[in-house]
Amino acid sequence: MVKTALEEFAFLIPLLPALAFAITFFFGRKMPSGGAIVPILAIAASFVISFAITLGLLANPEEVISQSYSWFAVLNIGILIDPLAAVMLSMVSFVSLLIHIYAVSYMSHDAGKARYFAETALFTAAMLSLVLSDNILQLFVSWELVGLCSYLLIGFWFEKPSAAAAAKKAFLTTRIGDVMFLTGIIVLTSDLLKVSGGFQDGVYLLRFDEIFSYIPELAALQINILGFEISHLTIITLLFFGGAVGKSGQFPLHVWLPDAMEGPTTVSALIHAATMVTAGVYLVARTFPMFIAAPDSLMVVAYFGGFTALFAGTMGIVMNDLKRVLAFSTISQLGYMMLGLGLGTAIGLEAVGISLFHLINHAFFKALLFLCAGSVIHAVGTQDMRELGGVGKVMPITAATMTIAALALAGFGIPGTSIGTSGFMSKDPIIEAAYLFGEHSSNWIPYVFSILAALLTSIYIFRLIFMTFTGKPRSNYHGHESPAIMTIPLSILAIFALAFGALTRTGFMEFLEETFTNSFVNLDIGALAGIGENELVAAAGHEPLAVLWPPVIVALAGFAIAFVIYYLRAFSLGPLASMKNPIYRLLYNRYYQHQIYTEFFSIGIVYGIIAFLTQVVDVIIDSVVEGIGIVTVFVGEELRKIQTGVVQTYATALIAGVSLLIILVKLIMEVL
């Protein structure tokens, strides 16, 4: 393709925030506002470049930006910007920019604000680098850096034991997924070497275009497990999905995400909207050609996603902490995204479009929800909804924008029209695709999961709105509206939460699908779907109104339930919402997963392994130390015998040693 100025600047997208990290880390303490201006300007520049590239690709989707620098056949650093990467780059940089601007005021009184802005700049750089990667190994390196940054930011207030514990929990839990992801890369590399005939000059096998070109050969490799022939490609994609389960908070590795609320609220917004948790969804979307040739893996993705969406919703309806409700909503919405990708067995490439479209829209209204929560906490000083009430009277802008975000999360709109919130435009197509899958395969489980999750979503988000902003204050707080530097980002995000979906729906999803139709030469998604024997539904996108209305009806039902109970207070839940109720207690304690993981896995298994290894290591170390002591004494005694004090003896030993060295050198030279 013709080189453009934008292509030459593409490498600056992650580099500028990385440089901002270095500058802020070393000099931020001496600068106003902790050096916040440095990452803000850097991320703004990254957004401008990203958005300009996205506009260029909208005009010519096949004109991808691809730059690759190889070191022999084993290492490669490259940039790949196709429609999928372009929209992610624009979203990550834009949302991160607004969060950084908001944080100038939110973190203004924090003594560690310079460290905060340095770490958030690095966090953004790591995510941008992950999205830009043109090969799976480079993506994994950025993936690990994202995990490290989340650890640092969740534990930002490390002097608090709860924050330090939450950071360690997030780091260790996501490591389980990371090990699976790395194992998948190792298996993939081994298989690629097998089917390609080994390393070749000028060819880097782990580039995505190279991986995709060998999918038929990878699918042909089989392994017999308990009498079942399983494709190597199925194993690889399941391992990749295991990595995504950890990063994107899917069941059963979701337990770290609610505790991640221990960091500053702006960190929560960054993790839940623009960086950490979207990485897993992006991984599955980026490697989608591999998944569509392994339909069993896609079905696993669909089931886990659908179940997670419902499972998280059951816990969200009983939480009283403002941020924890939003955390469970994130887990649930990520489940929808995974469900959308998993439905690729039925709707093919459209799965990437509907899932990533929801990811982008979710980033806007989820960032808005968290920043509004931060605005309330910043002004009132508490995040317990039982102590709030009436906040809308003193914080009208925050209340209005958070209500807009709630409408988007619940998916309010008019079916069959272009009238609706961004969440309606992106979440409902996933539910509709689940319906088509059920109609086509008689498997209604994903649809049931998704429709029930939609009901719970509406209940818990409007429960939050009514408990926080309506009624009378339930404590002696003295609230006030946040300053303009905080409310302006809220207003901008509210506009996107309302209108982005309606303005971009059809064209945006078609643009995303261009990733695998025009961006990769010789990539035939139809042929790969045939390898997996997928039976694609031709009716996708043309559903009757009877299919379009149920998601909206359950959203209205959820609103009505929350309105009657928490706004009108027509009746009290009484003992139903108390710890005396075993079901409530089960949900409030999150199904006791933390206790199970801690006591069974951590204490029972891990401590047992540690105790065993400790004994083994102690024996080895003791033996080695004692052995070294014995050998040292023995060698010392023997060497003492040749220390005669006679100069002639020393001269003879020196000549003999030099002669031996000369002989060895000559022998080596002859061999070479």
From Swiss-Prot:
The chain crosses the membrane at residues 8-28, 37-57, 79-99, 136-156, 179-199, 225-245, 265-285, 298-318, 337-357, 360-380, 394-414, 447-467, 483-503, 545-565, 601-621, 652-672. Optimum temperature is 39 degrees Celsius. InterPro entries: F420H2_dehydrogenase_comp, NADHpl_OxRdtase_5_subgr, ND/Mrp_TM, NU5C-like, Proton_antipo_N. Optimum pH is 8.5. GO terms for biological process: ATP synthesis coupled electron transport; electron transport coupled proton transport; methanogenesis; methanol metabolic process. It holds the Pfam family Proton_antipo_N. It catalyses: methanophenazine + reduced coenzyme F420-(gamma-L-Glu)(n) = dihydromethanophenazine + oxidized coenzyme F420-(gamma-L-Glu)(n) + H(+). This is F(420)H(2) dehydrogenase subunit L. It comes from Methanosarcina mazei (strain ATCC BAA-159 / DSM 3647 / Goe1 / Go1 / JCM 11833 / OCM 88). The gene is fpoL.
